[in-house]
Regions:
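A short, surface-exposed helix-loop junction/capping segment
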Residues: 12-24
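Extracellular-facing segments of soluble proteins and assemblies that are Gly/Ser/Thr-biased and enriched
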Residues: 62-71, 105, 113-120, 134
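N-terminal hydrophobic or amphipathic helices/low-complexity stretches enriched
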Residues: 1-15
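Conserved catalytic cores of phosphodiester-cleaving nucleases, focusing on short active-site segments
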Residues: 39, 110-125, 132-148, 156
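Domain-level recognition of nuclease-like catalytic cores that cleave nucleotide substrates
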Residues: 157-226
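Nuclease catalytic cores
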Residues: 24-77
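Catalytic core of pol beta-like nucleotidyltransferases
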Residues: 52-57, 95, 150-151, 158
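A recognition module on extended beta-rich or small alphabeta surfaces enriched in W/G with H and D/E
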Residues: 73-103, 107-113
C-alpha cells in the first residue's frame, strides 16, 4: 500500500464522507486533506457537533477540496468545508487552501484554516479574505520525499508573525529536518514532524488542535468540558 493510500484511508475514516481525492491525487494535496480530517476528528472527540457544507450553505456528505490556494468566498467551484459547534460557543469553520489577511494587510496562503463562522460568512458576503484576528488556527502542511527545506519554515514564521499570535500557528510535516526543528523552536512556533498515519506524532498534532479548541470554548462557555 502506498503512502497516499494510507492518507486516503485515514482521512476517509475520520471524515465519514466521500472525498474528491483519489489514489491519483498528489501526495501534498492529500496530506492537506489528512490534516483537515485530523481537525474534524479532534473536534468530534472533544464533543463537538460537526457537519459539512458546500459554497452555498447546503449540507453535504460529498467533499470537494482545493488543490491550490484560493479565496474563501470563491464561487468558481463548489468547494466544501466543515462546521464545528461546541455547545454555546461561537461556531467555527474549517477550510483547506484559502488566503488569510494578516495584521499587516498582506494576504497569506493557509493550508488548513480554522476560523469563526461569522467571519467566514462575512467573507462570503463581502468577498474579502478572513482577518487574522478572527482565525483560531492556521496549519502549515508539508509533504516531502526526504526532508523539509528550511525556507518553508521561514516562510511560515512570517505568516505566524503576521497572524498576531503564534499560539494560532502549527507547522506539520511528514518528514523531519534538524534545521527546521531548531528554527521553529527559536521562533517558538508549534510543530510536529514525521506526522504520518500510525506515527506517535499524530497524537501530538491532535493535542495541539485540542488546545486551540479549549481556548476558543473557554472564552465563551467556561462550563463546557472538552
Amino acid at each position: 500500500m502506498s503512502r497516499v493510500d494510507d492518507l486516503l484511508n485515514e482521512l476517509r475514516t475520520h471524515l465519514r464522507a466521500a472525498v474528491s481525492y483519489s489514489t491519483a491525487s498528489k501526495a501534498n494535496d492529500v496530506y492537506e486533506g489528512f490534516l483537515f480530517s485530523l481537525v474534524v476528528a479532534t473536534a468530534r472527540k472533544s464533543g463537538a457537533a460537526v457537519h459539512y457544507k458546500d459554497r452555498v450553505g447546503n449540507k453535504t456528505h460529498s467533499l470537494l477540496f482545493r488543490t491550490s490556494p484560493g479565496r474563501l468566498w470563491s464561487t468558481k467551484h463548489n468547494y466544501t468545508y466543515a462546521v464545528v459547534e461546541f455547545g454555546t460557543a461561537p461556531a467555527l469553520e474549517v477550510h483547506v487552501g484559502v488566503y488569510v489577511q494578516g495584521s499587516s494587510g498582506v494576504q497569506h496562503e493557509c493550508d488548513v484554516l480554522v476560523l469563526d463562522a461569522d467571519e467566514a460568512a462575512l467573507c462570503r458576503s463581502e468577498r474579502t479574505s478572513p482577518r487574522a484576528a478572527k482565525c483560531l488556527l492556521a496549519i502549515e502542511c508539508k509533504y516531502y520525499a526526504a526532508y523539509v527545506p528550511l525556507n518553508q519554515a521561514r516562510g511560515f514564521a512570517g505568516l505566524s508573525m503576521d497572524m498576531g499570535n503564534r499560539d494560532h500557528s502549527l507547522f506539520v510535516a511528514n518528514v523531519g529536518s534538524g534545521s527546521v526543528t531548531k528554527y521553529l523552536n527559536r521562533q517558538k512556533i508549534a510543530r510536529e514532524l514525521h506526522a504520518v498515519p500510525g506515527a506517535p506524532e499524530i497524537e501530538g498534532v491532535q493535542s495541539l488542535i485540542r488546545e486551540a479548541f479549549k481556548a476558543h470554548v473557554g472564552r465563551s462557555d467556561s462550563n463546557l468540558r472538552i
